[in-house]
Amino acid sequence: MAQVLKPAVRARIETAALRCFADRGYGRTSMAEIAAAAGTAPANVYRYFASKEALFAAVVPADLPARHDRLLDTRVAALAEGRAHGPAAAELLDFWLDQRLAVVVLLDRAEGTPVAGCPDAFVRRLVEHAERSLPAPPSAVHREVLVLVFDNTRRALAHILRTAEDREQARAMIAAFWSYQLPGLDGLMAALRAAARDGSGSSPTAADGVGGAT
């Protein structure tokens, strides 16, 4: 007689797997470790998921990156229009909070998975948005500054989402992070626009308001 699979056990395995993937990364996580975290035997995990790849696909759906990109683009467009708060900000934040550990994987633990390109794509997407707001292409030095800033953004968000004790703490930490990040980004972009207009290519200084951008 075939064993009946229980939704509660499946959910427990998926929760344990997502936490392991977010904490240690896909490559460093074994099915035995997931089983231990779920409080069951490895053989039981394989009754629900034929492989680690199948388990990953269940907890990080294939459409998750595209959904995240759409919300991110909408949020950045709102910021470009001077709307730091509003529906776009709320929708992206809710997505991060609803999919906390899956977003951690997308932003910082994607190596060896079908979403391996997501961390670099996140940074590249934000850099391209920033470049489009400039009157001329940035110099190589200024573009490298943008990459550094947005890579730090990626890492900070992933850290907050992975380490926060609960949804409300994550929300509070992200709000505090943005209160620091957004003014710094405003200062950085003002300096880069000025450099692009005068064609000097000179690097912004702390006096231009860059100090809080990272």
Question: Residues of each region from the PLM?
Answer:
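Helix-turn-helix
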Residues: 12, 16, 20-54, 58
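Alpha-helical DNA-contacting segments of helix-turn-helix folds
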Residues: 56-63, 115-119
